[in-house]
Every structure is written in structure tokens, then in C-alpha cells.
Amino acid sequence: MNTKELIASELASIIDSLDQEAILKLLETPKNSEMGDIAFPAFSLAKVERKAPQMIAAELAEKMNSQAFEKVVATGPYVNFFLDKSAISAQVLQAVTTEKEHYADQNIGKQENVVIDMSSPNIAKPFSIGHLRSTVIGDSLSHIFQKIGYQTVKVNHLGDWGKQFGMLIVAYKKWGDEEAVKAHPIDELLKLYVRINAEAENDPSLDEEAREWFRKLENGDEEALALWQWFRDESLVEFNRLYNELKVEFDSYNGEAFYNDKMDAVVDILSEKGLLLESEGAQVVNLEKYGIEHPALIKKSDGATLYITRDLAAALYRKNEYQFAKSIYVVGQEQSAHFKQLKAVLQEMGYDWSDDITHVPFGLVTKEGKKLSTRKGNVILLEPTVAEAVSRAKVQIEAKNPELENKDQVAHAVGVGAIKFYDLKTDRTNGYDFDLEAMVSFEGETGPYVQYAYARIQSILRKADFKPETAGNYSLNDTESWEIIKLIQDFPRIINRAADNFEPSIIAKFAISLAQSFNKYYAHTRILDESPERDSRLALSYATAVVLKEALRLLGVEAPEKM
């Protein structure tokens, strides 16, 4: 039980009109530490109690007598709690030094499955910074849900089907060079894709030709299938190399093509339940009762099935295969209307588990304020970007620590971590402008700043030869160590908030705050000097390092021991 929960529990025992959960939501952290560590505003009780909030606050303060508080005083309409710093710091440091990286582990999920649809790049197109968001947000959510007791299934729903393959086949047959594609598959396929789109703007017959080749592909034409398979295989080799760079793994690569033979069954169920309506030759599901104006288009007039039909098939397959407690789609916010339709159609089909489906949208990455587009060739490719980030990180590491042994390995962890952290510290639904220089900086709210704080602590612990299991009883009561203790104590709640809101930025911002608080402490405290507090200060340093490393791990970022 953390401090806020303890206060809420104590208050709930003497307040009849509010339960513990409601009290917890009302608790505040005073801006001025002289007003205590936590405050409870009595305004909400005034109407029920028919008393002035000041009087209620005074009565509550008088009734509080827990050992955990140094003192409890009423200041106007607030009950201000001053916590016993020594007792709480001892409790927190004991917990972290005992549990180590398992500190803040929880079993909320009871080992139930969470399916995470993430990354999902399009075959035969380069892996760009635009795909990075879904990849790193999904990967971080996987770590976060595992931390609170769920099992996760990471699905890479590859874009390996659709009209774009018709376009690519036409482009390859017109202008392609087999040897050039074999040598540099993605580069060559991208050039072909950009060229056919540009030419199709002036020559509509290319669009029709592409549709025809896609129809051949759908009908199992040997040449079309062979080219499609080749494009897919070459792309996957490239993608897997990048996923290895990012240290991201998947449990399934079932993409769009996997559901080709599963969509007719969806159409049959919709038909049997009388949900399909005719509209201009197409078959649709009306969703007006869900407040959705546009019907879900299930089958076009030419008999072709659509994106939503495929996603319905995927949802049914995943529920059957994984019996998920939650199914999360980490997909850009421009797809919000699609996922509202998906959930509504599943609800219409009688599947109550549609409530367990969540679209986790995210904002766009721009470059100098401009939207990125593969079709127009205006794209930031991930592979050269990672190489550049690693190179910049290495320059800074060599300047800071020229004697470091494994510079290349550390530079890779810092460069890749910098890109991931910058993405994840941004509130998910906001976009951000891509700025590699800002990402790789060791100053400011960046991944390298947090990693460097961790490495600095490891250096202190090595100098002291500190082993937590041999440390004695420790406690601290100074103001600067207290700021760190409060953050560490809050870590389990931070993880829960990140999971509840599908928001890794909550963890990233926490890591920044903890690193900043420790750096401030380090600047003002002689940690290694012989003193009665030395062991306790080292224990605090150790606990900070454990929590920083774990916070970074939850973001999919490595924490080098030396930098």
C-alpha cells in the first residue's frame, strides 16, 4: 500500500459519505512542501455535512492518528499530511533492495492474454519513421502489461495484400530489373512504386491495369503469386533486420493475406444474422443505432471484400486462437472511424467481447512540419536514421569517456534508445517533429540523459563496492532524498496509470523526473563520504538505478552499465 492509499484508507474510516477510491482521486500534492506532502480538500464534504470546509478539515485532522504521519494539520479547507520520512524511506529502500527488478511487479492480469496488433508495415515498401510509432508504442505496452501480470501476444499484421501489389506488378513488368531488385530489393521496389503512382496521375489506364493484375493475384494466377511471394520474402528479410536493430520481437506475422480464406465465413455469419443490407449493389451493415453515420461496407458491387471484412475475420480468429482479455490495435488516429465500425459490427454480430477491443491511436511524425508520404517519396527511412543516431551517440561517448571498452555496443544502445525514447515521451495522441539532434542529446528530456544518470549511479556503486544484500538498516529524512523516495514509491501506481491509459509516455516522463531528482541530489550530496548516512545514501542510489533501469526496460530501451 503506497502513502496515498494509506491516507485514503485512514480517511475512509472516518468519512461516511466517500469511499476510499473517491478519496484517492481527491488527494493532492501541495506545490509548497511547507504545506505538507499530501493534502485532502474538504470542499466536497461541505454539502453533505452542512458545515464549512474549514471546520470539516479541522475535525478530520484531529481524528487522524496513524503512526505513518509525522503530523496532520488543518490549513483552511485542507487537511495537510506530513509524512514520516525516516519510516517511509526505510520501507521503500527495503522493498527495492529485496525485490530488485521485480519491484512494482503486480498480478492484475492473472496471466490472461493481451493481443497487441502493432508495427504492421506494408510489404515492398521501406520501413520508415512513420512505422516506428506503432512498433515502439506496441512493444512498450507489451512490457507494461507483462509487468502487471498479463501474457502478451504481439501480432505484426503485415500489409501483404491489396491493390498496391497490382501497381507493383505492373511497374516491375514495365520497368523492373531483376538483378537490381535482388541487389537492393526495398530501394528498387520503392522507386518502382513511386514511379507508377506518379505516372498513374497522368495515365488512368495504369490504375485499371493494376486492378486487373490484383484480380489475377486474388484468383491464384501463377505469375502474379510468384511475384507477390518474392516481394514479400525480400521485404521480410529487410524488416527482420530492422526489428533486430530495434530489439523488437513478434509472436505472429499473420498479415492481411492470411485472412483471404477466412472472409467468406464472416460474410456468411452476417448474412445468416440478417445484418447485410443492399446499397447501390454493395453489401453493408447499418450502424446508425451506434451513432455511426456511415454503414460498414462489407462487400463491393464487384464482389470484392474490404478492409473491414478482413479485420472482422482477424478479430474472430484472434479471439478463437488466443481467448484474449484485451485486444489492442496500435494504429494511427486517422483510422479511428474504422475501429468504431469494427467494434460496432462485432457487437451487432452478438459478440460481447467486442468491448475488450481498444484502438490505441497515435499522432503523426512530421519533418520540418511537413507530413511524410511513401507514395510521394517524401519519407525518413529508419535504417539510415538508426545508423546516424548510433554514429552521433558514439561521438558524444568518445568525448565523455575515451577509455570506454565497448564503445560500439554502448553507442548502439544509446542511439537506438534515443530514437525510441523521444517517440515514447510524446503523449501518444500528439504528433512530433522528427529532430535527430534533439533526440541524441545528453541534455534535456531525452533517452541518453536518463541512460547517463543510470550509468553514473553504477559508477558510484562500483566505487563503493556496494552490495544491497549486505547493507544494514537504512533510512533518510532530508528533503532532496525525500523527493526521490516519493517517486520510487509511486512507481507501481505510475505503471498502472500507463496500462490503464495505454500511454507509455507516463513511464518516460517518470524516468525523466527520477533522473532529474537524482542528478540534483548528486550535485548537493557527498554520497561516498564517510558518514552515518553513507549506507542509506548508497541504498538510495541503488534503488534509483533499479527503478530507472526497469522504467527504461518498460520502454524497450537498454541501460548501459558504463557510458
Swiss-Prot record:
Keywords: Aminoacyl-tRNA synthetase, ATP-binding, Cytoplasm, Ligase, Nucleotide-binding, Protein biosynthesis. Its main location: cytoplasm. GO terms for molecular function: arginine-tRNA ligase activity; ATP binding. A motif ('HIGH' region) lies at residues 121-131. It is an enzyme of class 6 (ligase). The keyword Iron does not apply. It comes from the Bacteria. Disulfide bonds: none annotated. Coiled coil: none annotated. GO terms for biological process: arginyl-tRNA aminoacylation. The keyword Ribonucleoprotein does not apply. It catalyses: tRNA(Arg) + L-arginine + ATP = L-arginyl-tRNA(Arg) + AMP + diphosphate. InterPro entries: Arg-tRNA-ligase (IPR001278), Arg-tRNA-synth_N (IPR005148), Arg-tRNA-synth_N_sf (IPR036695), ArgRS_core (IPR035684), DALR_anticod-bd (IPR008909), Rossmann-like_a/b/a_fold (IPR014729), tRNAsynth_Ia_anticodon-bd (IPR009080). Pfam families: Arg_tRNA_synt_N, DALR_1, tRNA-synt_1d. Its EC number is 6.1.1.19. SUPFAM superfamilies: Anticodon-binding domain of a subclass of class I aminoacyl-tRNA synthetases, Arginyl-tRNA synthetase (ArgRS), N-terminal 'additional' domain, Nucleotidylyl transferase. Monomer. Belongs to the class-I aminoacyl-tRNA synthetase family. This is Arginine--tRNA ligase. It comes from Streptococcus pneumoniae (strain 70585). The gene is argS.
